Amino acid sequence: MKDAAEELSFARVLLQRVDELEKLFKDREQFLELVSRKLSLVPGAEEVTMVTWEELEQAITDGWRASQAGSETLMGFSKHGGFTSLTSPEGTLSGDSTKQPSIEQALDSASGLGPDRTASGSGGTAHPSDGVSSREQSKVPSGTGRQQQPRARDEAGVPRLHQSSTFQFKSDSDRHRSREKLTSTQPRRNARPGPVQQDLPLARDQPSSVPASQSQVHLRPDRRGLEPTGMNQPGLVPASTYPHGVVPLSMGQLGVPPPEMDDRELIPFVVDEQRMLPPSVPGRDQQGLELPSTDQHGLVSVSAYQHGMTFPGTDQRSMEPLGMDQRGCVISGMGQQGLVPPGIDQQGLTLPVVDQHGLVLPFTDQHGLVSPGLMPISADQQGFVQPSLEATGFIQPGTEQHDLIQSGRFQRALVQRGAYQPGLVQPGADQRGLVRPGMDQSGLAQPGADQRGLVWPGMDQSGLAQPGRDQHGLIQPGTGQHDLVQSGTGQGVLVQPGVDQPGMVQPGRFQRALVQPGAYQPGLVQPGADQIDVVQPGADQHGLVQSGADQSDLAQPGAVQHGLVQPGVDQRGLAQPRADHQRGLVPPGADQRGLVQPGADQHGLVQPGVDQHGLAQPGEVQRSLVQPGIVQRGLVQPGAVQRGLVQPGAVQRGLVQPGVDQRGLVQPGAVQRGLVQPGAVQHGLVQPGADQRGLVQPGVDQRGLVQPGVDQRGLVQPGMDQRGLIQPGADQPGLVQPGAGQLGMVQPGIGQQGMVQPQADPHGLVQPGAYPLGLVQPGAYLHDLSQSGTYPRGLVQPGMDQYGLRQPGAYQPGLIAPGTKLRGSSTFQADSTGFISVRPYQHGMVPPGREQYGQVSPLLASQGLASPGIDRRSLVPPETYQQGLMHPGTDQHSPIPLSTGLGSTHPDQQHVASPGPGEHDQVYPDAAQHGHAFSLFDSHDSMYPGYRGPGYLSADQHGQEGLDPNRTRASDRHGIPAQKAPGQDVTLFRSPDSVDRVLSEGSEVSSEVLSERRNSLRRMSSSFPTAVETFHLMGELSSLYVGLKESMKDLDEEQAGQTDLEKIQFLLAQMVKRTIPPELQEQLKTVKTLAKEVWQEKAKVERLQRILEGEGNQEAGKELKAGELRLQLGVLRVTVADIEKELAELRESQDRGKAAMENSVSEASLYLQDQLDKLRMIIESMLTSSSTLLSMSMAPHKAHTLAPGQIDPEATCPACSLDVSHQVSTLVRRYEQLQDMVNSLAVSRPSKKAKLQRQDEELLGRVQSAILQVQGDCEKLNITTSNLIEDHRQKQKDIAMLYQGLEKLEKEKANREHLEMEIDVKADKSALATKVSRVQFDATTEQLNHMMQELVAKMSGQEQDWQKMLDRLLTEMDNKLDRLELDPVKQLLEDRWKSLRQQLRERPPLYQADEAAAMRRQLLAHFHCLSCDRPLETPVTGHAIPVTPAGPGLPGHHSIRPYTVFELEQVRQHSRNLKLGSAFPRGDLAQMEQSVGRLRSMHSKMLMNIEKVQIHFGGSTKASSQIIRELLHAQCLGSPCYKRVTDMADYTYSTVPRRCGGSHTLTYPYHRSRPQHLPRGLYPTEEIQIAMKHDEVDILGLDGHIYKGRMDTRLPGILRKDSSGTSKRKSQQPRPHVHRPPSLSSNGQLPSRPQSAQISAGNTSER
């Protein structure tokens, strides 16, 4: 069975390998299919046509003027856009003319109608882009084809193709019909209302300016768009008229739409998108807006001031008048938290004069965002104001920008992360932390660093950012951030102590990002620091920084302190002083990312269950400010009525509108890491259904600001996929920009005049997850987000493709910085309002004015980011990279018309043409856009839900990159385009009504345009056929030259470091790729066939696997013949390896084929380049005289039709241009020769391709043979399987025999339960080993019993002996005491008394009346005994006067020899001590010493006897000789007569001579102790004397035991009767002896004998 299982496992592995092979085939098939599609889209040489006369006229005129600015400017807008013709309807002019274009051109650029651009019906839209001229058609490839190529190479891996010039041309008849049809429906140039700006001088630094009259746009009743009106469109005038991006105040450039226009889009005029910012614009030092040669895919110039794209009083859906509900901006007169009306502190984005709510007019107190180009230097640039007209950045350097970031403004991330913010704030300005002075604020944060921060070091940065952190909002790390953050540290304190924070937190402002998210801010303000602005003076910062308190928890580390507190607000609870539960503004333990204590994961602002009375305004319904039990990464408790998440009365720059019912500022159950937690997954910043008017602008219906249940990665989540940033159904102007450090809602690098379009529905300002880090909202087509003719330098962030960001056809000089490659900024021919940015997740740039409540792309919906229940039918194309009309990375040089017929669709060109008049937002997929799903945005008909009906259109989606197949499921929602996985085709489907409307309206307009064009060309060709033909050729040559020059520029930029030959080879290789032979398609079919065969083989293998698994289950008890099966499977392994090898060879062959194909035309390319270079000079000279030749040719025809006033007085004389005819003829001949060379080259290439085809066929044959071999192996496997089945039958028989044996065993086997029971009761050997045998135990017990009995007997005998001896000792002691205390004491006292009496008689005291006041000797007083009335001689009471220094005795000399006479030494030592302690003269001392010595001698003998007795009987406490010596020494020292002087016996000698020999003679060498040094203290302190008196000491009793006693009383020393008897007892005198060791007591004295013992000793000595 084990072998069988192994074989089955191997079979599964084999199936997996087959699956992998199948995937490889499928991938190869997709790639080949992609190549096939591209080949099918490559037009043939026969498609090259001539240009129309009308286009030729305009082209020559524009070309003449453009040539004056230099040949380089010819490439201004067609750069990287393929070989667009200079004069063809599809070719964009090399440079935009400064002359007013004809009305046909203006309308063509706005209409978007091409000859064949109406797939399934197209008649233009109802928007200004009802038709786009053929010139605009070529602008599409020029703006997108090249711009998308870099991304194509980087992301999609699709080869970058440059379309040939033939790709740009359409048939001549189609051009005529298209133009005639269009122009017939529009007013002529001379019929335009309003003044017309005539030819304006064009500055050389403005080659890309787009001419536009002041009335090029007007409103038509039958169209919901912008059309030529009397409106003064200063943004459409040549750039030379005004400084770049500067709109004259006299002109109503507040917005492109004129007043009373109900539209939300701008007219896509002819604009060269590839150089939105002219290369030579004065002041082009964009301060880092974009580095030269940097691929700033969507960087938009900032200098222009887009007020909001509407005029005051206009009901612009995206810009409402004053007092209206400016959903996303402000309402006049309200405390706009971030966006305020004019006349007040414009912290936000508002117009001062017109309540443009977020867009401000110049000359007002624009604290927020003021027009960079309209704000004079003298004005108070308190906002993002440009001090001069020439604004290289927001503010001119050196200008005093007091309020670039207005104090207290909601500057969350004034500079967006990763964006190249040239000068969000100008250097040199007093930016208090915004910028570094004198520095090029290339990003206003350090380039290359994730400096979502605001400023550079070197300024008084007020600590704007955290160094080294993810500065989503403020400054460069490691710099001198004096205030906001300590530079180079993990922000222990948000503000450095002692630093002057002039404006870190302006009073009354809401510094959302005062503390950087994720930063370590132990305290928003460090206590003791000079927090001038952290808590602004005059602001009631009760909670921001408690006065005198350590605000270490005001902003806890790891928390997102977007704005700890709002200055000017009574922050009673932000860090509530005197509130215990506000220790960190939020108690730790809760998930408070906002204002919490350090160490706790404070994802939310407060701890769940804590009533944060002050975090929101006290008195408000702050249930808990954070819902308990949830991960409150946000500020408020979901479901709570947050009338003031922040204080209602405070200037909450948009955090929460005061008085607004913030029931769910944070969606319940969502991950609220912070109100706007950067880098976090804000599933729902706001609770669904809550009226979040304050979270974004007041007055905005922010029902949830985030869709409930949607993955709201963050209200302003940087770098996250913010697809559903806002709640469906709510007018979410786009609170923030996702995809970057959106600490604030201000678009980095630009004056966010329209960051939130008033009343517009830009669903998130920037769709979450979109590449556009810029201001453009992916979900809405912000036509007027960047006004035409202005310099919104930062409107589009780098790396972002904003197709509809700028108005096509409008002059956005700075919309894109020079060198920036806007991959999706180009406008398309048709309705540009529906154009979408190219980068991913620009899903459906719907016009801002559309009522797009929650409309999001289907992909967003699939990811849970779209509003549930919202009809998002056509908000976005159904696939990932729906940012623009074309998928990034594809070759989109120009959309190819479906066919001439409006209702037909070319089978090989699955793309959409321009929509009808009612389809304002239709997007046009190009056939070359493999991998792009497109949807027609029928804003009012079939595309917008709720307008006219459902309608969708999506195209083939091949190579959709970045798309999760699991998320590309067909949507079952009504109106949502079905999403397909990569490699699948999405069918085109629309509602019949929408198609009919498109057909009817499109054909109507198209016929007019075409008829007018045909008439114009017919008139000219009839009169001047040669000239017409010549100019046709000239236009084509110009197109070829321009394309080739553009391609060479591309090569110079992209192939830097290579030789010219390599560059040319690369260019020609791409050109050759367009002519891949059709045989490759057959090869692709063959590969598909092989793939199908692989599928069939896979099915067979799966059947075999099922058979094996089924039989394996039946063979549970069988043994398989593993050897044979392994052999068969080994053969399969070898086969699989061979197949893989063949596949590898196939890949290599394909790579070789590609390389050969690229190198096939290298020789021809050199010659072609040489010829084109020769043509260059001819074309330049031809252009100089082209206008003259034209006027000469046309003069005879127009003489009778032109009025006298209409004749050009400056017309050139015909004779002046005669010399040009020869050159023209030479040019024609050269052109014919060049055409012949191209044809010959085309003929020669198929032969080489045939060879490559044969090689590919051989490779395919090998693959097929390999597959056949696999089939053979499968047959072998079938045979093996049959063998296995036979074996199975045999094993089945064996199993039957086994069953019989089992039955027999069942009868004869032992009972298992019985065995288990026996085993259980069986003794355990290991347990027995630990037990003791009974015999051993008994023997040990008996032995112990015997030993105990012996011990008892011994103890009893000893106890009897001890008792006898004790009794004897007691008897003897009693007897001795009687003898000692009676007779000897009596006799001694009697003798003493007699002696004293005798002395008194012999020497009575003499008293003199007037003697000295003091005497040396103590006086004696006469006293009588109370009992016997005997006279007594006692010394006078009082302190004894010491006569010698008191101090411890010096150590005695000790010999190494043992003592022999112990008692003698004891007496000597103490007698010496006694001699110094007496107050009597030396003679008296001698007598006293003799008496005392006798007593001590007897006492010592008694002690020795006691010691011997105790040693013999083993008393409890043995009195050893050492103890006895110490006791004797202590007794002597403790005697009262010796208290006067300490022991000085070591160096004192007796005056009485002593005899030699006797008991006092030493038997060992004795040396007197000489005082080697003085004692340390001669006089003992009074404390020591008192302690000596009252210390409790041990007393040695006569019984040998030691008792407790005190040393208070001592018997007086006994003196002899007279000094004469001293000699009789010399033997009793003490002798010096060796000093003994110190005593054991703490004070140096051991316990003394009791009085009775001392007296007894004295008596004994007398005896």
UniProtKB/Swiss-Prot annotation:
<feature type="region of interest" description="Disordered">
    <location>
        <begin position="423"/>
        <end position="481"/>
    </location>
</feature>
<feature type="coiled-coil region">
    <location>
        <begin position="1286"/>
        <end position="1325"/>
    </location>
</feature>
<dbReference type="Pfam" id="PF16043">
    <property type="entry name" value="DUF4795"/>
</dbReference>
<keyword id="KW-0966">Cell projection</keyword>
<keyword id="KW-0472">Membrane</keyword>
<keyword id="KW-0539">Nucleus</keyword>
<dbReference type="GO" id="GO:2000059">
    <property type="term" value="P:negative regulation of ubiquitin-dependent protein catabolic process"/>
</dbReference>
<feature type="compositionally biased region" description="Polar residues">
    <location>
        <begin position="131"/>
        <end position="150"/>
    </location>
</feature>
<comment type="subunit">
    <text>Interacts with AKAP3, ODF2 and TSSK4. Interacts with AKAP4.</text>
</comment>
<comment type="function">
    <text>Has an essential role in the formation of sperm flagella and flagellar structure maintainance. It acts as a suppressor of ubiquitination and degradation of proteins involved in flagellar development and motility.</text>
</comment>
<feature type="compositionally biased region" description="Low complexity">
    <location>
        <begin position="206"/>
        <end position="217"/>
    </location>
</feature>
<feature type="compositionally biased region" description="Basic residues">
    <location>
        <begin position="1623"/>
        <end position="1636"/>
    </location>
</feature>
<keyword id="KW-0969">Cilium</keyword>
<dbReference type="GO" id="GO:0031965">
    <property type="term" value="C:nuclear membrane"/>
</dbReference>
<keyword id="KW-0963">Cytoplasm</keyword>
<feature type="region of interest" description="Disordered">
    <location>
        <begin position="948"/>
        <end position="984"/>
    </location>
</feature>
<feature type="compositionally biased region" description="Basic and acidic residues">
    <location>
        <begin position="1609"/>
        <end position="1619"/>
    </location>
</feature>
<feature type="region of interest" description="Disordered">
    <location>
        <begin position="1609"/>
        <end position="1663"/>
    </location>
</feature>
<dbReference type="GO" id="GO:0030317">
    <property type="term" value="P:flagellated sperm motility"/>
</dbReference>
<feature type="region of interest" description="Disordered">
    <location>
        <begin position="575"/>
        <end position="615"/>
    </location>
</feature>
<keyword id="KW-0282">Flagellum</keyword>
<protein>
    <recommendedName>
        <fullName>Glutamine-rich protein 2</fullName>
    </recommendedName>
</protein>
<feature type="compositionally biased region" description="Basic and acidic residues">
    <location>
        <begin position="171"/>
        <end position="182"/>
    </location>
</feature>
<dbReference type="GO" id="GO:0036126">
    <property type="term" value="C:sperm flagellum"/>
</dbReference>
<keyword id="KW-0225">Disease variant</keyword>
<dbReference type="GO" id="GO:0030031">
    <property type="term" value="P:cell projection assembly"/>
</dbReference>
<keyword id="KW-0175">Coiled coil</keyword>
<dbReference type="GO" id="GO:0005737">
    <property type="term" value="C:cytoplasm"/>
</dbReference>
<feature type="compositionally biased region" description="Polar residues">
    <location>
        <begin position="84"/>
        <end position="103"/>
    </location>
</feature>
<feature type="region of interest" description="Disordered">
    <location>
        <begin position="880"/>
        <end position="925"/>
    </location>
</feature>
<feature type="compositionally biased region" description="Basic and acidic residues">
    <location>
        <begin position="958"/>
        <end position="975"/>
    </location>
</feature>
<dbReference type="InterPro" id="IPR032013">
    <property type="entry name" value="DUF4795"/>
</dbReference>
<feature type="compositionally biased region" description="Polar residues">
    <location>
        <begin position="1639"/>
        <end position="1663"/>
    </location>
</feature>
<feature type="region of interest" description="Disordered">
    <location>
        <begin position="80"/>
        <end position="239"/>
    </location>
</feature>
<feature type="coiled-coil region">
    <location>
        <begin position="1085"/>
        <end position="1160"/>
    </location>
</feature>
